[in-house]
Amino acid sequence: MPQLNPNPWFYIMLMSWLTFSLIIQPELLSFTLTNPLSNKTSTTTRSSPWTWPWT
């Protein structure tokens, strides 16, 4: 059962995670957000219950 041999698969997994962690992730984190964060408190909207015609 060659799929149980971790030699090639472990290397591929390790290289892909290193590529993601060292190259792709810092580039993604450097982007600015399109909507800046605000300190406003979120308002909760109250909804009235639906009046069902058959009750």
From Swiss-Prot:
Q: Report the GO molecular function annotations.
A: proton transmembrane transporter activity
Transmembrane region positions? Answer: 7-29
Q: Which Pfam families match?
A: ATP-synt_8
Q: Which GO terms describe its biological process?
A: proton motive force-driven ATP synthesis
Q: InterPro entries annotated for this entry? A: ATP8_metazoa, ATPase_protein_8
Q: What are the record keywords, sorted?
A: ATP synthesis, CF(0), Hydrogen ion transport, Ion transport, Membrane, Mitochondrion, Transmembrane, Transmembrane helix, Transport
> Where mainly found?
mitochondrion
Subcellular location(s) of the protein: Mitochondrion membrane
Write down the membrane topology. Answer: Single-pass membrane protein
GO CC field: mitochondrial membrane; proton-transporting ATP synthase complex
Free-text function comment from the UniProt entry: Subunit 8, of the mitochondrial membrane ATP synthase complex (F(1)F(0) ATP synthase or Complex V) that produces ATP from ADP in the presence of a proton gradient across the membrane which is generated by electron transport complexes of the respiratory chain. ATP synthase complex consist of a soluble F(1) head domain - the catalytic core - and a membrane F(1) domain - the membrane proton channel. These two domains are linked by a central stalk rotating inside the F(1) region and a stationary peripheral stalk.
Q: How does it assemble?
A: Component of the ATP synthase complex composed at least of ATP5F1A/subunit alpha, ATP5F1B/subunit beta, ATP5MC1/subunit c (homooctomer), MT-ATP6/subunit a, MT-ATP8/subunit 8, ATP5ME/subunit e, ATP5MF/subunit f, ATP5MG/subunit g, ATP5MK/subunit k, ATP5MJ/subunit j, ATP5F1C/subunit gamma, ATP5F1D/subunit delta, ATP5F1E/subunit epsilon, ATP5PF/subunit F6, ATP5PB/subunit b, ATP5PD/subunit d, ATP5PO/subunit OSCP.
Q: Which family does it belong to?
A: Belongs to the ATPase protein 8 family.
Q: What is this protein called?
A: ATP synthase F(0) complex subunit 8
Q: Which organism is it from?
A: Musophaga violacea (Violet turaco)
Organism classification: Eukaryota, Metazoa, Chordata, Craniata, Vertebrata
